[in-house]
Amino acid sequence: KYRALVLKNNRNTEILFTIYLNQDCKISDLKNMIKNNLFFAAKLYPLHATTNSSSGVKDIKKMSKYFEFLEKNKIPLCLHGEHIHKDDDPYERERRFLEYELSWLVKNFKSLKITLEHITTKDSVDFVKSNNNIAASITTHHLLENTNTFLGDYLKPELFCKPIIKSKKHQKSLLSAALSGNSKFFFGSDSAPHLKNYKFTESCCAGVYSTKYSISNILELFYSSKKTNNLNKFLTINGCKHYNLKFDNKLISYVRQKDFKFQKYSKFKNDSLINYNHFKNHWIKN
């Protein structure tokens, strides 16, 4: 029903559907879905790693039959890369995931196409560079924010997300990877719309709603860094190549507007969504 609803409201966009992979999935169902071309990739969340992951996987190493199935059928595996344990520091979860889960995964399933989504650390950048069957997506907010902007003078709940925003050292590594044009890194917004009442509250939801200004922020980042020659690689080419997708050669031009008045909130039902934006300048389609 959800797939039908999305397609009904689609406007000339190729929608790549993913399944929520966990230990309750049946291989027979996956076979039938592949036969009917119902999904493109599988997404795996560790249990309780982030918002809406209460049906996630407790022990990845017990999922071998699913990884074998994905590998055999050339289905990409997309990962939220955090090791979840009650004693783990939230700032160490991504590094520990590389050590305990991902190292095992790439070693035992060498032909499985893996995407480590929304990476946040230098450790992940180095890991992706050193392994052949894996690439990574990077979000706008993890490129542009760090612990100083998130937790510095004031706590900004609108920047609270999972994996949590890291230090300048890690931010610098993410920026270097994105701006370099390296084919193993590409844009992934991980945009998560949560109502204002659920963000500015005692126990706020994890997620940054970046959709409205993501492309503008990425354009300004590459422009101000004098790396526009690598912009298309990060935004379109690298991701398409990783997933073996054709990309449209049509060019879109943008114009830079200085001191643009940004819309902080977007009304939604009886509440509003908090739009993420970093720069004062804005890029609009020409």
Question: What does each model-found stretch correspond to?
Answer:
Residues 107, 180-246:
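His/Asp/Glu-enriched, well-ordered alpha-helical/loop segment
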Residues 1-34:
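A metal-dependent hydrolase metal-coordination microenvironment
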Residues 15, 42, 114, 190, ...:
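Conserved, mostly hydrophobic/aromatic
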Residues 9-14, 104-113, 224:
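Short, surface-exposed connector motifs at secondary-structure boundaries
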Residues 215-286:
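Mid-to-C-terminal alpha-helical segments outside catalytic/metal-binding sites
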Residues 21, 119-120, 234:
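Short beta->alpha linker loops
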Residues 25, 29-44, 52-187:
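Histidine/acidic residue-rich metal-binding segments in metalloenzymes
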Residues 1-6, 101-102, 217-219:
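Short, well-ordered amphipathic alpha-helices
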